[in-house]
From Swiss-Prot:
GO terms for molecular function: mRNA binding; structural constituent of ribosome. It comes from Picea mariana. It holds the Pfam family Ribosomal_L13. Keywords: Ribonucleoprotein, Ribosomal protein. This is Large ribosomal subunit protein uL13. One of its GO terms (cellular component) is cytosolic large ribosomal subunit. Gene3D superfamilies: 6.10.250.3250, Ribosomal protein L13. Disulfide bonds: none annotated. GO terms for biological process: negative regulation of translation; translation. InterPro entries: Ribosomal_uL13 (IPR005822), Ribosomal_uL13_CS (IPR023563), Ribosomal_uL13_euk/arc (IPR005755), Ribosomal_uL13_sf (IPR036899). Belongs to the universal ribosomal protein uL13 family.
Length: 206
């Protein structure tokens, strides 16, 4: 990425699985403001510190906030994990300025890993990983589970699609591993068969 991590590409695909929501959002907000194009996948597996019951109570309090005279004017309450992440990042960006709006427009977030991103290399952000930032034994909950509790209706669908994608990826991985094994055997056999010719060429200093 641009700011300090040493990676800079036209588009970075971030696997959000087991990343802390706030830390991930703050890092991505800075990257977006630096001009980096970011795609976030598997938003339903983002972690939030605190148990599910406490997080659900906090979100239900947020859902009660509305404009009395015209509730459709806001605040808008998103239920999907990708939109919750998008709104969190929006709060860390001056999105009402041209620079902030342009930065926010370069962010894309998805539940699961839709094509073509299932065939692209995905990266993680160590500074936002749960295993490095959350104390052992501390309670946490998944954003997808929270979204399901507050009205997101696609949790089961995304889970089923992810299981199918993982099974397909495993078959593809086993096939590639088998082909690599056959290729290495073919190289060893060719080296044995060509050993006399190679010795002759070496003696001629070719």
């Amino acid at each position: 990425m641009v700011s300090g991590s040493g990676i800079c590409a036209k588009e970075v695909v971030v696997d959000a699985r087991h990343h802390m929501l706030g830390r991930l959002a703050s890092i991505l907000a800075k990257e977006l403001l630096h001009g980096q194009r970011v795609v976030v996948v598997r938003c339903e597996e983002i972690c939030m510190s605190g148990g599910l019951v406490r997080q659900k109570m906090k979100y239900l309090r947020f859902l009660r906030k509305r404009m009395n005279t015209k509730p459709s004017h806001g605040p808008i309450h998103f239920r999907a994990p990708s939109r919750i992440l998008w709104r969190t990042i929006r709060g860390m960006i001056p999105h009402k300025t041209k620079r902030g709006a342009a930065a926010l427009a370069t962010l894309r977030a998805f539940e699961g890993v839709p094509p073509p991103y299932d065939r692209k290399k995905r990266m993680v952000i160590p500074d936002a990983l749960k295993v490095l930032r959350l104390q052992p034994g501390h309670k946490y909950c998944l954003l997808g589970r929270l979204s399901k509790e507050v009205g997101w209706h696609h949790f089961d669908t995304i889970t089923e699609l992810e299981e199918k994608r993982k099974a397909k990826a495993q078959v593809s991985y086993e096939r590639r591993k088998q082909l690599a094994k056959l290729r290495s055997k073919a190289v060893e056999l060719a080296e044995k068969q060509l050993a006399p010719e190679m010795e002759l060429l070496a003696s001629l200093k070719y």
